[in-house]
Amino acid sequence: MMLSRPKPGESEVDLLRFQSQFLEAGAAPAVQLVKGSRRHGDAPPDRLPPQDHRDVVMLDNLPDLPPALLPAPAKRARPSPGHPLPHDEDPEERLNRHDQHITAVLSKIVERDTSSVTVTLPVPSGVAFPPVFHRSQERQVKPAASGKRSIFAQEIAARRVSGNRVTSAEQVVPSLDTPEGAVPCETPSFRDRSNQLPGRSHGFHRPNLVTGKGLRSKVAEQEVQTIHEENVARLQAMDPEEILKEQQQLLAQLDPSLVAFLRSHSQVQEQTGTKATKKQSPKRPSVLVTKEEPVTSTRTREPRTGDKLEEKPEATVEDKMEDKLQPRTPALKLPMTPSKDWLHMDTVELDKLHWTQDLPPLRRQQTQERMQARFSLQGELLAPDVDLPTHLGLHHHGEEAERAGYSLQELFHLTRSQVSQQRALALQVLSQIVGRAQAGEFGDRLVGSVLRLLLDAGFLFLLRFSLDDRVDSVIAAAVRALRTLLVAPGDEELLDRTFSWYHGASVFPLMPSQDDKEDEDEDEELETEKVKRKTPEEGSRPPPDLARHDVIKGLLATNLLPRLRYVLEVTCPGPSVILDILAVLIRLARHSLESAMRVLECPRLMETIVQEFLPTSWSPIGVGPTPSLYKVPCASAMKLLRVLASAGRNIAARLLSGFDVRSRLCRFIAEAPHDLALPPEEAEILTTEAFRLWAVAASYGQGGDLYRELYPVLLRALQTLPTELSAHPLQPLAMQRVAALFTLLTQLTLAASSIPPEPASGPAESCVPAIPSSVTWTQVSGLKPLVEPCLKQTLKFLPRPDVWNALGPVPSACLLFLGAYYQAWSRQSHLCPEDWLQDMERLLDESLLPLLSQPPLGSLWDSLRDCSPLCNPLSCASNPEALPSLVSLGCAGGCPPLSVAGSASPFPFLTALLSLINTLVQSHKGLCGQLSAVLTAPGLQNYFLQCVAPAPAPQLTPFSAWALHHEYHLQYLVLSFAHKAATLQPEPAASTALHHAVALVLLSRLLPGSEYLAQELLLSCVFRLEFLPESASGGPEAADFSDGLSLGSSGDPQCRRGALLVQACRDLPSIRSCYLAHCSPARASLLSSQALYCGELLRVSSLLLPVPKEPLLATDWPFQPLIHLYHRASDTPSGPPAADTVGVAMRVLQWVLVLESWRPEVLWAVPPAARLARLMCVYLVDSELFRETPIQRLVAALLARLCRPQVLPNLKLDCPLPGLTSFPDLYASFLDHFEAVSFGDHLFGALVLLPLQRRFSVTLRLALFGEHVGVLRALGLPLTQLPVPLECYTEPAEDSLPLLQLYFRALVTGTLRARWCPILYTVAVAHVNSFIFCQDPKSSDEVKTARRSMLQRTWLLTDEGLRQHLLHYKLPNSSLPEGFELYSQLPRLRQQCLQTLPTEGLQNGGVKT
């Protein structure tokens, strides 16, 4: 039945009707589908489709299939019912397949399958390039049997035929390349020749000339084999002489040109084979054994000495096996007998058997050369000479096969394997290597940083690409490695453990503090312009460039968050992978506010986490490993919400309102941890994190409505606390939960006292909503009676260090709550002050005074020095593996007990105690006298003495910034209490001067985020007369007495240092106003810090502190106003000076004089050279400023302090100075200013002369005598007023020839005269005299010529006085009018020098004495 094709008007109904008709007719279909066997391909030949009609083009030089760009996923298919697994398979093969040992994974490392790739050698050609093909070219190829072939197919076929012809011609060479006319002495022995004959070669399987072409395809191969066997039999029956004779006859019958052609091709093939043999590695046997070599011809190769081994014919495969295996060890018998029916057992393949040989012996490293690091599968660094057994899976066939372990390069190579287990294993090993490197296990055993090497090699993006894998095990390994890289061990534990400290929730962002070069170039731009430009540039920068400066930014640029969301939402990994992902998200959220916002705004990420890992209902979970975390509450998910909320108040508000976190908090807090149907440890951590999240929200004044709902729950929890605190032993997790509860109550109490901020006009403050807190004082007033018994109970354990350390932050949290409670109580204006005053007195009598009298408290004060990071800078040393692009606190092995965060640290408790004391004294000043004993504790005094001792500034690392931030809290609280006590005491305490020194040092060390503390120090301690007891105890008189002993008495009493100090003490209020105007932090930062420290929760915008790039104030902050004046004058040199220029300069000089006289340790960090540069700025500010009498007196006093004998050796102008790019440039501008406006001012001239000392750089003296010679006319400072000894300028002798020539020229020309510039005149005469009479035999010819010329010119001078001075100079003496002594008669050596001059010079004047 023949059906017509469908027509345009027919529909699907018609097609179905046609199909029904066709099926009813039962006709045979036009096409029959045949499904061949998928295993063996044993379909009948008659059913195979013909291939003649297809136009197939085969490329010999390219594989049939393109290489796989990505590793193919592992096939997940179960056996179909039609093909069950065979039950009669080999047990050994089944065991190998199910072997789960590590060696089973590493036994076959396959990166890409190349077994199917056909490798063909290029066709030899006599021309450099193949001929160009033209369509008009005639073809000799037989056309295809069926149909027309394409031009491309015909060309490929022609090339293949020509290649076959050349190959067949080459195969003729072994048979015809005979030693024609061989010399008898060069003929090899019979044994060697017999091995070289074709019949004796076991590897000769087929003939070279007889191909069977022309016969039928079925009998061609059989006939060829028959002919071959007959030829071999005849050759074996012949003698070698007969064979050679037959060869000679055959060569005589052939055309000589054909023989020459075949021999030339044989020589080319032999040379090619020799080159290939040389290129092979000597360690691996050659496997390219295809044909035997003929007897060599004496005409083609000349014999050479020692050429026997090289010319030895290549043995067959069996001979090679005998040669290689027999000399070593006897061949072992196989456990089974091989059968002839087995495939591929007739030919031994050496390259495949090479790996079965024994490993070469381990080479011992005899030298100190560096070796490649190798690691075990557990990430351990293996010693170069370690000898491990092979069953551990640490040996492979790469470089240095005898050494165990894997290098980083080999592990990177293994991550690209097609086998998923190998990729997962490589990632796991790399993860463990990173973990051990961060823990510092490698130490000095490796050269360089492992982490830096991995990141430079692209390890970060290798992990990112591995996350896109389809295999779950590879994804899990990649996530674990990413967590190991980003999340430093111990960092999160440290931050969690210190959350309940004094402002413990406020942390620095874990982001790099180094700015990019682009950011450094934009320092001069406005802030708004920088923000506008920075965002698009960062978006266009590639991820590797971002990761080079900031790893987190580079990762976020690779769309990491959507991939993690996909893994959580779609793949549903196991519990360990989920915890790793949550840990990575927490680390991303700690990076910055921007990163936290990206985590929050990632589509469906937070929704998935809240819904899947913080459900409100779940099935009970028992103790033990949880098979799945989905629909099960997870503490890490709650912690992620808490860290996100800490980044900003807006994020906290969005979490509470947009993700239904309020209901989650109610669900997890309403029940006790043991009633949550979760494992006990997980329940404790979950409840703790819920309390912390609520406390963070309460830090912004949010979450007050939850307090009303959960008020009964909180009261019940407080009532059970005494029972928990009395249990032994105390559980650390339970103590963390109790401390988190107290922290929550502290923030809720502060929220009850917060006053709504007034509407602000600034744009930075307008975003803060002025919404009053929903928590009132009435709701929190009943909490203190429940917390105070807990404090009393914990204080009883103070004499027991083991129990006290087990309490953790609980006592500190209790004290902080009480401080917040009394602070809020004192702010309630509608309540009677007498109530809270009496309650404070009761607390003092019942709790604080007994605590202060306990000896264990003194032990806490004594341990401050041991635990202080400021006194022990090495405790904050950065990890050698720390990277600037990946910030971490570096708490790998945990904190030692005697450290700022250790279990025995006194800082959290003492800081909380001082906070409570300050709150009580602020409200009740009558308690100050009873609590002042704290300030006189011996341990505190020793600690402060160590803090102000001269020492280099602590290096600012992420951990040191965190630790110092908490240490500075304690110091500030002590100083704040000392200020309150000093204002109430009639006489200053003995430790007042020490407290003042600590305040001055602390002011230069405070970090960003502590702007409010710096402002309070400037207002309170620093410029208070009470903290300068020297002003009332004979300090000015002692200063005058000291100056009289060292410098002599000054004529004018007003110029004495004592009078200047007295005036400075009177002007302290003006000095404070000056520094408040120039050293106060920015207003926005100050308001943010004030809101945080004063408990103004409605103004707090974030708990993330600014990045600690550097301290708030520079180390030379006392000179800061003066530097501002200098910069302002430099920016507007022609403008009029400011009205307050004289006042600012005078206040700065007064304060610096006070510090130089009574607090010299504060200026220890400012080098003397930097102080000199600041004094020079006084003269550069204005042309008339230095003429003011107060300025001159203060500068003279400071210059005298700078020129003291004990300070002068430390005056080094050649080293880099802080805040100064180049001192020579500053000195050059100073000389210009002196020449223009000085009018011979002596004090100005003293500052000019001070850098010209002999020990300083010659550049400064060259600048004066070369470019500013006019200065010499006005530099009339007398010798008696020189602040330093004259010998500092004249000794040692000058060795700069250009400067000596300038000296001589200035003297000869009259530019430098004794009455104009007596000091430099003396210096020039001394150095020229020393030069012209120098007898150094090592001098160069140029120096000798210049010396002789200068001496001759000196002798011929017409100025008798100058010649007398240059020739008869003896020693410098500032007491003489000339400034030096003269010889009455020239010494003999000088006379001899003069006698060496030319005779005409001597005749003119003779030798005068």
UniProtKB/Swiss-Prot annotation:
Pfam entry (one): RPAP1_C
Chain residue ranges for the region called Disordered: 34-95, 189-210, 265-322, 511-547
Start-end of Polar residues biased regions: 265-275
Biased composition (Basic and acidic residues): 39-57, 85-95, 290-322, 528-547
Keywords on record: DNA-binding, DNA-directed RNA polymerase, Nucleotidyltransferase, Nucleus, Phosphoprotein, Transcription, Transferase
One function term, GO molecular function aspect: nucleotidyltransferase activity
Domain of life: Eukaryota
Role according to the record: Forms an interface between the RNA polymerase II enzyme and chaperone/scaffolding protein, suggesting that it is required to connect RNA polymerase II to regulators of protein complex formation. Required for interaction of the RNA polymerase II complex with acetylated histone H3.
Family the UniProt entry places it in: Belongs to the RPAP1 family.
Protein name: RNA polymerase II-associated protein 1
Organism of provenance: Mus musculus
Gene: Rpap1
